[in-house]
Amino acid sequence: MDSIIGRSQFVSETANLFTDEKTATARAKVVDWCNELVIASPSTKCELLAKVQETVLGSCAELAEEFLESVLSLAHDSNMEVRKQVVAFVEQVCKVKVELLPHVINVVSMLLRDNSAQVIKRVIQACGSIYKNGLQYLCSLMEPGDSAEQAWNILSLIKAQILDMIDNENDGIRTNAIKFLEGVVVLQSFADEDSLKRDGDFSLADVPDHCTLFRREKLQEEGNNILDILLQFHGTTHISSVNLIACTSSLCTIAKMRPIFMGAVVEAFKQLNANLPPTLTDSQVSSVRKSLKMQLQTLLKNRGAFEFASTIRGMLVDLGSSTNEIQKLIPKMDKQEMARRQKRILENAAQSLAKRARLACEQQDQQQREMELDTEELERQKQKSTRVNEKFLAEHFRNPETVVTLVLEFLPSLPTEVPQKFLQEYTPIREMSIQQQVTNISRFFGEQLSEKRLGPGAATFSREPPMRVKKVQAIESTLTAMEVDEDAVQKLSEEEFQRKEEATKKLRETMERAKGEQTVIEKMKERAKTLKLQEITKPLPRNLKEKFLTDAVRRILNSERQCIKGGVSSKRRKLVTVIAATFPDNVRYGIMEFILEDIKQRIDLAFSWLFEEYSLLQGFTRHTYVKTENRPDHAYNELLNKLIFGIGERCDHKDKIILIRRVYLEAPILPEVSIGHLVQLSLDDEFSQHGLELIKDLAVLRPPRKNRFVRVLLNFSVHERLDLRDLAQAHLVSLYHVHKILPARIDEFALEWLKFIEQESPPAAVFSQDFGRPTEEPDWREDTTKVCFGLAFTLLPYKPEVYLQQICQVFVSTSAELKRTILRSLDIPIKKMGVESPTLLQLIEDCPKGMETLVIRIIYILTERVPSPHEELVRRVRDLYQNKVKDVRVMIPVLSGLTRSELISVLPKLIKLNPAVVKEVFNRLLGIGAEFAHQTMAMTPTDILVALHTIDTSVCDIKAIVKATSLCLAERDLYTQEVLMAVLQQLVEVTPLPTLMMRTTIQSLTLYPRLANFVMNLLQRLIIKQVWRQKVIWEGFLKTVQRLKPQSMPILLHLPPAQLVDALQQCPDLRPALSEYAESMQDEPMNGSGITQQVLDIISGKSVDVFVTDESGGYISAEHIKKEAPDPSEISVISTVPVLTSLVPLPVPPPIGSDLNQPLPPGED
């Protein structure tokens, strides 16, 4: 047993540890969130408050009091959503820990007076549960303290505040107030057997008898009063449909929850069904009747409505319910239950009749009772009046000036002799302070004022003398006869006689007083003589009246500051507006001048006047105005135009822009004169940008006048000035593409002007003062051409399927000069359309006849500054070149998209073009210049130069190839020493040797002299390849040797004798250097090799027979030169060198006998 107990204790301690840890974790989180609340944004604050509410009130309610102040402090946050979240937190607090009600109820009362209607509605929604939970909590207290009493007082205050909100201006606040009052009525009433039962229901039966804060009877009376207010509100004629439906629903709920009120609710529904508010529209009437039908059906299901079933059934029939539907709604009851309810109905009716009869008797008895003057009440009124008068007099008697004035005023009225009454009542003034004397005199005078019912104390007296029921002594009746004393009878008769005499006397006095009053009334009814104004006044001169008028208006105008300080500036503005709109012209012009003196600060007054003139023009106002012979809109137009001109003349540039824009955008109507003035303003250089933007905004914001403003922009889009044209076209694009305003009209105008270009000379419609071209011109100018197609080109990217076709038609039919103008203007629209435009790609693919130049220009534009052209574009251009357009220029823009083989195939055709085009081609191929530096080619500069050397001269002129190679070699940044070495290395491997190889070698030596050793090696390799068999190359070989002498002399010694003889014959200047070199070689040991005697003889010039293998002297014609097929495996050989497959390689002839003794070239030993 002990082990079990110990284990239980252990489990409890462990649970406490986990609970403490959970609480500590939650506290840490909430502390962090509260710290973040200080600097967080409103949305973040709401999220953090929701987290705090979920953590504190959801799982760790013991932390609620600790962090309550941190959350409640946000009730003063400027953001509405944050304050609503605080209300939600307070509502949840009152549900979870209602004992914290005294701490939060002040915040609820404060937020109920919030400036935001949304916050007020949320507070009213929360007050429903707060009031219910608070009422239950206060009822559960055995000994409520001061905090509980204060909480109940504030709850009562909140209840009163929400009750006042039933007449609030906001519809939503009224609806929420109705729902709250519904809950109050249910809470403050008793439930019975037919009441609808709900979980957590509360009624007056749950209020304990010992509760000292409130009593059942008081709460019940208050609930009944609130129900009466709801019923009264439900029957008002000005109620809105939303409030009416909400009030109907609330009354239905009250009747279901508290059937005791069923009769009043059914009667209210009956009145509503018979008399719907006249302010409702047809749709609202339908909604109200539908809601009323639904609520009546709900009531009929309740057992408490058995007594009123016939009334409800009649209303439902009137609202469209069938008999079967109604019968299904009536709850099922057995016969005993129905009999019991019928009996209760009869008892209630009998009690009602009895009560009505009892009330009628009491009312009749009350009327028959004899009344007498209530002297006690009259004395109390006199005392209260004396106190009020005494206080009033004491305050004034403390002022010496008032006392002195009073004495001096009444001193002459004193009698010559002292009245006897004064002597009787006078008491000598003892030694009293001034304050005591003032009190004494004030009391004395106050009593006199009260006697005469004068002074401020007269308000304490009731209008009628206070009366009370006269008490009559009960006389016991006896069955025995009483003896009557004759003296007593006589005494009684004398008293009765005196009473009659007094009554007669009073009646006579009353009649005399009534007669006097009647005389006064008759005199008052006599009509006084009316005096006519013309009889007693003299008319003022006209000029004087006008001066008085203008002075009065000027004083009103000059009181601007005083009216602002006094808070009546709006009333002053309204007064000035009416005066300006209805008074003669001199007043109008004076007010206009006053406005224009400081138009920036008085623009609101100008707008008020403008709208007043508009109201007069449209007949919206009851004010009259001075009739004139002008048109009805003259005053409005004159005011608007003067305002516009005044702003333009008197304001600086910045204010002018702002105010002109406000006037045109806010004016109720814009006459044609004002629009024309805006057009003239837009011609000003400083205002053109803002003016055209304003015209565009007017076209958007004033739909009835959009045709006029679009027409203005169209005129500006073909204006002679370029800046106006560009601005207008940009705004037309916005209207055309973004706002979709009159796109058909804009298309029509643009195409009409585009077709002007097809004519031989500019038509007359192009020239007008509105377009800035008043003088007609006989011939087309470039500027005029651009004006005609400018708008069409601007709209081309937004509707290419229409404009591109029209532009193509115009391009085909126009002259060459205009075609060039069109081609130069295509850049911007084509770039906006982009390479992925299907319309452009289709045009490139189709390329109608006569459109080749236009298509090529479009391709150029689409490939500008693009690293690699679009694949689809390259494909279309390739197909175009192969199938339709044989002009190689079409391939130039897409060079960077071609493959290596395609580039080599088109290169011979490209270099045959004019020099300017060839220069551009090589700029593209080599990436020269900023325009082409970003392009990537399939061939390197080395490959390009090698490909140029391998071009077949039968296909391309040698001069074109020479120019092309010169263009390449001129780019020293690209063709460096290393690049040229690579080029020459590849060229020497080509068979047959390229014709221009030695020329390129010589140019390379000229550019880079340090290539001499490399060139020497090339020359040796050329001897091996029998360079003398190609005449042009042989000549270049010899020129290279000449440039490299004397270093090149050993190269000559490696030539066969016949070629050495030929070299010395062609270049005699080589002989001395060669002789010198040979002599130097003779002085050295032979070391196994040397110069033969035959060579020495050739060098010395002696006659030596040299045998040549053929009659050509060793030269082979180009058509018989052996060409080796390239081997792809060799890197040094370019795979793209064209091979003449038609030629069969010739066998190399064996060397002659004399050549066998010649030394081999270096490296061939």
From Swiss-Prot:
Segments of this protein annotated with the region Disordered: 365-384
Localisation per UniProt entry: Nucleus
Subcellular location, principal: nucleus
Biological process, per Gene Ontology: co-transcriptional mRNA 3'-end processing, cleavage and polyadenylation pathway; mRNA 3'-end processing by stem-loop binding and cleavage
Keyword set, alphabetical order: Coiled coil, mRNA processing, Nucleus, Repeat, RNA-binding
GO MF: RNA binding
HEAT repeats: 23-58, 61-95, 98-140, 147-186, 218-257
Knockout consequences: RNAi-mediated knockdown results in overproliferation of testicular cystocytes undergoing transit amplification leading to increased incidence of spermatogonial tumors.
GO cellular component assignments: histone locus body; mRNA cleavage and polyadenylation specificity factor complex; nucleus; tricellular tight junction
Domain notes: The HEAT repeats have been determined based on 3D-structure analysis and are not detected by sequence-based prediction programs.
Stated family: Belongs to the Symplekin family.
Subunit structure of this chain's protein: Interacts with Cpsf73 and Cpsf100 forming a core cleavage factor required for both polyadenylated and histone mRNA processing. Interacts with Slbp and Lsm11.
Function per UniProt: Component of a protein complex required for cotranscriptional processing of 3'-ends of polyadenylated and histone pre-mRNA. Involved in germline stem cell transit amplification, differentiation and mitosis-to-meiosis transition.
Protein name, per record: Symplekin
Organism for this UniProt entry: Drosophila melanogaster
